């Protein structure tokens, strides 16, 4: 229903209690939201103090990021040039992100927030053996427009964001179902889904081979000696997965995926 001069309403704010976590309040939110008209999914964190870029601080954990080696050469060079972290210009950064983070959903009708998944509670050893324990919901990339690059029909780079490290969480909501990307403690990552209070279910992850998506396709790859070889997707592992905020509608989930063999000789 359309309203005349509608007022903005705060649904979840910094300082509100974190559902399912005793005596904790939200300290940070992410920009990636998914909304289906009733439910809103979002990323949130708690337990973080002021961030010290050099040492982190209470509630923050160090992560190691490496400059990309593929893609736009100006972006890659900008990543190397900006690196004054540790050994300067080696392309290896130490940044920080919240220890305690999770995926949540807010119900506009019931006016309640529910936790979908969270990172491992470091104070509870038993959680590390939980098949649905997650290490991270943030995915990092070095992106932006390098100074002096562009122009012409696209305009100057002056009004475009310069390249830097950016983090994003990925979730999509469909009624009482929430699909999300996450990284497990073993380093694998995947797309997972949860319905209400049911256990989290794995949809796809990087421990699976490509034939879970396509049992029929066989790629024809060319070797260095110009000979060709037929490679079924059962010989390739899922390498990357993509999930968009509006990709989950009418009980159907749209994703993207790439695959490669363990030596990265063949890919699709």
Feature map (PLM): residue ranges:
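Conserved "turn/edge" positions that cap or connect secondary-structure elements
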Residues: 1-268
